[in-house]
């Protein structure tokens, strides 16, 4: 993916970088960053980033795309680490800079201790495997320049993993020690760095030991930071799993929700930034971790909502149960009132029927006696008529007339008696009909009473209040046949019960008293249940408000997530468009590069051919020069011989002249 980006993308990143975005997230380790004359960590890092951006911004147009990209990331990496210590001020390990090192570095025993600690640290961190350079105690006692360079670079990359060594060794080491504020930098100069294995090795050994301690402290701080994050996450999950009972706890849970979301975004941005600094463009694992974190967050919210829903369902079930019990109580109370009214009506009806039943036998007996008297009277009249007929047949007509007159009088009397008898018979029949209807109504009333008692007993048995129905039922004889000669009495209708007041009424009063006692107990229990119901309604209301607030919060979070997803999708589309443009540009550049490579290869071939020609020409000229040189040497030798001969001749001549003188 790095090959697809062009210079315009790199320049856009350079121009859009805001140093404060990075420095605001880096913790300050130095304890005295606010002292006078000592700028803070964030200020130092901001200055370094600004300088790096300015330097890269000026040279980005003249560099190739990969060089601009690497320069950008290296500048960011080199500007990231100085936030460990305050810039321009004292070191984090010493409040004052001193030119004198208090450590006994010249002591051989102390040097042995430092060498052993450095060797153990390098071995424990697998120095030889990572660098491919073997290390031993001898390398720390009598180091070569290569040993020192490997150890120094490895130790510094423990502090700044993205740093790239580009300049000369003396300048690079000295500038790095100055940047990280080595407290004893004045004891080292650049000329000593080029030959560290001599008499100045103890200074560099102390410097390497200081770097080792700094790396160990940094590892310890990062480990504690990871532990604190883990503990904080555990505490957050513990708090979120606790049930909410008050509004303050609900607000605290909402704050924990917000902190979890912020922590997810901060971790995602931090990991992406670290990956960008390390020249890695694959952010998909971090995005997957962010999605997993959001899934966990949504799962926690859904779990809370499900818990609240279950609590609401339980409270709703309790409320429905109490409401059903109240409805049953109201129904029992209404049935009790109805049965009580029916009992009063039945009692009044029984009393009225009892009074009537006491009068009807006497009236019926009187009617029977009158009927018997009338029948006897009729028999006497018929006997007299027969006698009169016999006497009439024996006496004369006068007597017959008298008899006719008497007959007329008797017939009138008979008509009068027959009319009275008819009236009496009609009244007897009407009374008989009334009595039959009354007896039927009485029997129907008894059946209704017994049915009501059976229903009442069944209802009481369902309520676990058993009652003996034999104590309340009025037994009625089966197949009752009433004739004119049968007197209607309680014994003719009822079976085994001659007095309802003495047998049934006490039992009904006893049951009524028990019902009144249970009603009073149920009223007391109902009052308590109503109090509990009011409390449960208040709790349901508060839980409902909490649920509404959480639903609103969830909807807000979902809307924000949808907005963020839309923005991300739009950014992704724009980036894809830009990537396509860059790919087309890269294809064009690749085509041009291939052409230039072919041209360069042709030029290389031409240059190689010219080189061969020049080599042959040089060889030929060398042969010619050798010949000329031989001639010159021969000429010089001959000239020397001639000069020596002339000198010897001159010397001999001079000697001869001197001798002649």
From Swiss-Prot:
GO biological process: attachment of mitotic spindle microtubules to kinetochore; cell division; mitotic sister chromatid biorientation; protein localization to kinetochore
Pfam families: DUF5595, Ndc80_HEC
Iron as UniProt keyword: no
Region (Disordered): 1-38, 54-101
Start-end of Polar residues biased regions: 8-35
Subcellular location per the Swiss-Prot or TrEMBL entry: Nucleus; Chromosome, Centromere, Kinetochore
Coiled-coil zones: 368-398, 507-623
GO molecular function annotation: identical protein binding; microtubule binding
InterPro entries reported in the protein's UniProt record: DUF5595 (IPR040967), Kinetochore_Ndc80 (IPR005550), Ndc80_CH (IPR055260), Ndc80_sf (IPR038273)
UniProt keyword list: Cell cycle, Cell division, Centromere, Chromosome, Coiled coil, Kinetochore, Mitosis, Nucleus
Keyword 4Fe-4S recorded: no
Superkingdom of origin organism: Eukaryota
GO CC terms, sorted: Ndc80 complex; nucleus
Quaternary organization: Component of the NDC80 complex, which consists of NDC80, NUF2, SPC24 and SPC25.
Function: Acts as a component of the essential kinetochore-associated NDC80 complex, which is required for chromosome segregation and spindle checkpoint activity.
Entry's family note: Belongs to the NDC80/HEC1 family.
Protein's name in the database: Probable kinetochore protein NDC80
Organism expressing this protein natively: Eremothecium gossypii (strain ATCC 10895 / CBS 109.51 / FGSC 9923 / NRRL Y-1056) (Yeast)
Gene giving rise to this polypeptide: NDC80
């Amino acid at each position: 993916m790095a090959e697809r980006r062009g210079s315009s993308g790199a320049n856009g990143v350079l121009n859009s970088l805001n140093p404060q975005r990075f420095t605001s997230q880096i913790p300050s380790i130095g304890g005295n960053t606010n002292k006078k004359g000592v700028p803070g960590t964030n200020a130092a890092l901001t200055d370094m980033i600004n300088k790096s951006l300015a330097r890269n911004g000026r040279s980005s147009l003249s560099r190739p795309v990969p060089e601009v990209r690497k320069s950008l990331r290296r500048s960011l990496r080199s500007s990231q680490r100085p936030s460990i210590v305050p810039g321009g001020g004292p070191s984090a390990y010493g409040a004052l800079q001193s030119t004198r090192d208090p450590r006994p570095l010249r002591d051989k025993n102390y040097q042995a201790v430092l060498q052993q600690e450095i060797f153990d640290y390098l071995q424990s961190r697998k120095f030889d495997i990572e660098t491919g350079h073997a290390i031993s105690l001898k390398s720390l006692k009598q180091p070569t320049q290569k040993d020192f360079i490997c150890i120094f670079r490895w130790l510094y990359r423990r502090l700044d993993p993205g740093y790239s060594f580009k300049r000369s060794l003396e300048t690079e080491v000295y500038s790095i020690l100055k940047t990280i504020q080595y407290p004893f930098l004045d004891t080292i100069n650049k000329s000593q760095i080029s030959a560290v294995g001599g008499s100045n090795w103890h200074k560099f050994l102390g410097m390497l030991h200081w770097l080792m301690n700094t790396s160990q402290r940094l590892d310890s701080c990062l480990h504690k930071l990871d532990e604190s994050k883990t503990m904080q996450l555990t505490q957050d999950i513990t708090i979120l799993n606790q049930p909410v009972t008050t509004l303050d706890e609900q607000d605290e849970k909402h704050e924990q929700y917000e902190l979890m979301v912020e922590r997810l975004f901060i971790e995602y941005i931090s990991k992406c930034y670290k990956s960008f600094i390390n020249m890695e463009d694959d952010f998909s694992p971090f995005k997957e971790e962010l999605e997993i974190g959001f899934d966990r967050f949504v799962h926690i919210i859904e779990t809370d909502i499900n818990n609240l829903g279950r609590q609401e369902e339980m409270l709703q079930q309790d409320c429905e149960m109490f409401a059903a019990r109240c409805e049953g109580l109201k129904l029992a109370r209404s049935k009790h009132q109805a049965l009580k009214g029916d009992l009063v009506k039945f009692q009044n009806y029984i009393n009225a029927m009892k009074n009537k039943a006491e009068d009807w036998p006497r009236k019926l007996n009187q009617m029977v006696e009158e009927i018997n008297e009338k029948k006897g009277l009729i028999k006497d009249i018929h006997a007299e008529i027969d006698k009169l007929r016999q006497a009439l047949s024996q006496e004369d007509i006068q007597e017959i007339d008298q008899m006719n007159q008497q007959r007329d009088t008797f017939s009138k009397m008979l008509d009068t008696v027959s009319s009275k008898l008819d009236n009496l018979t009609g009244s007897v029949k009407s009374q008989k009909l009334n009595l039959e209807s009354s007896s039927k109504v009485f029997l129907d009333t008894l059946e209704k009473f017994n049915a009501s008692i059976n229903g009442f007993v069944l209802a009481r048995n369902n309520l676990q209040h058993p009652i003996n129905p034999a104590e309340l039922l009025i037994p009625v004889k089966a197949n009752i046949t009433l004739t004119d000669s049968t007197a209607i009495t309680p014994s003719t209708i009822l079976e085994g019960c001659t007095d309802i007041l003495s047998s049934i009424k006490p039992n009904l009063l006893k049951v009524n008293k028990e019902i009144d006692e249970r009603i009073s107990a149920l009223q007391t229990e109902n009052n308590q249940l109503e109090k509990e119901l009011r409390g449960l309604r208040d709790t349901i209301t508060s839980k409902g408000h909490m649920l509404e607030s959480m639903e609103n919060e969830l909807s807000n979070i979902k809307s924000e997530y949808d907005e963020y997803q839309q923005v991300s999708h739009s950014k992704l589309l724009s980036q894809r468009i830009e990537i396509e443009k860059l790919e087309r540009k890269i294809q064009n550049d690749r085509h041009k590069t291939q052409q230039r490579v072919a041209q360069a290869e042709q030029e290389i071939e031409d240059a190689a051919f010219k080189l061969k020609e020049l080599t042959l020409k040089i060889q030929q000229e060398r042969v010619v020069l050798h010949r000329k040189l031989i001639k010159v040497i021969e000429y010089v030798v001959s000239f020397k011989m001639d000069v020596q001969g002339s000198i010897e001749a001159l010397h001999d001549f001079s000697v001869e002249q001197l001798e002649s003188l």
